[in-house]
Amino acid sequence: MPDPILLTPGPLTTSATTRHAMQHDWGSWDAAFNQLTASVCADLVAIAHGGDEYVCVPMQGSGTFSVEAALGTLVPRDGVVLVPDNGAYCARILKILGRLGIEAIALPFGEDAAVDPAAIEAAFAREPRITHVAQVHLETSAGVLNPLDDIAAVCRRHGKRLIVDAMSSFGALPITLAGSGIDALISASGKCLEGVPGMGFAIVRREALDASEGNSPSLALDLHDQYAYLLKTGQWRFTPPTHVIAALRAALDQYLAEGGQPARGARYVDNCRTLVESMHALGFTTFLDASVQAPVIVTFHAPDHPAYDFRRFYDAVRDAGFILYPGKLTQLETFRVGCIGAIDSNDIRRAVAAIAQAVESLGIAVQRA
């Protein structure tokens, strides 16, 4: 039986080449593995256009581990962090800061609205104690893309430090760190780079990292110590996810061969366009306005019909070979379909056909061209 296609924002469908890269065992202290780590880190900084101003600090675990590591390492204990909040992953940052004992100020927005840089600027005027902003670039709850360049410009203008969760955008959307003033950008192996889950990373401004010694309350999640040890020895402080890194190396090779960010982004845009147009043809409507929709995951309004049941719908789509995101994060009844991974528009068309059949199996009519 073939593997299902994952229509989620990560983990996602990977290529056979990427999966094959995990067939080899690596010694974590061996020179060959050290070179593998170094090459991965160099490529990640290059993708972010970080130049010599930024370094990559890899971290074991999911992307959230690296988000917590960055916040705990780069924000001093007396820092005050503004968190523009338009979804679940912004809320997670607030929860992390609470656990770290760092003062946080939430700046709420609707889950269907992008963060407004002017509102951030107004928050600076109201709360001059703010030292940092922690911003999710692409809020995956509904698929909203926040205006990172404009937010970074506001932070630069007011001398505030910016930490960016780019979990679901890095590699697919254009990001240039050099000259941005961003202190750190965090992402992970199992997202738009199309690797497998298990490794996060922070691309950190050298000056910010150098100034962070002793900040982290954690041993394992201390980015400063992690990078210092890596710089000194070429090795990870603690056992690395060797197979995950080998898979990421293979995924990066494919990413570069495809044409890097412009080509990866174009494929995802094509997937997203195909998905939205095909779903509209069936009578489904999108939750977000097109102006804030990112080409990574699309939220659709669920059928307004008494026979609709998400679990039965999800199971029927799964039985047809496609895995949707299980459950809703928005306040309204919705479901989400991802556009990323080692898939193309033909896979999307087949997925939409499966969605149509699943809805009809519930006794709900859909439009047919």
UniProtKB/Swiss-Prot annotation:
It catalyses: (2-aminoethyl)phosphonate + pyruvate = phosphonoacetaldehyde + L-alanine. It comes from the Bacteria. Pfam families: Aminotran_5. Its cofactor is pyridoxal 5'-phosphate. InterPro entries: Aminotrans_V_dom, NH2EtPonate_pyrv_transaminase, PyrdxlP-dep_Trfase, PyrdxlP-dep_Trfase_major, PyrdxlP-dep_Trfase_small, SP_NH2Trfase/AEP_transaminase. Gene3D superfamilies: Aspartate Aminotransferase, domain 1 (3.90.1150.10), Type I PLP-dependent aspartate aminotransferase-like (Major domain) (3.40.640.10). Its EC number is 2.6.1.37. Homodimer. Involved in phosphonate degradation. Belongs to the class-V pyridoxal-phosphate-dependent aminotransferase family. PhnW subfamily. This is 2-aminoethylphosphonate--pyruvate transaminase 1. The lineage of its organism: Bacteria, Pseudomonadati, Pseudomonadota, Betaproteobacteria, Burkholderiales. The gene is phnW1.
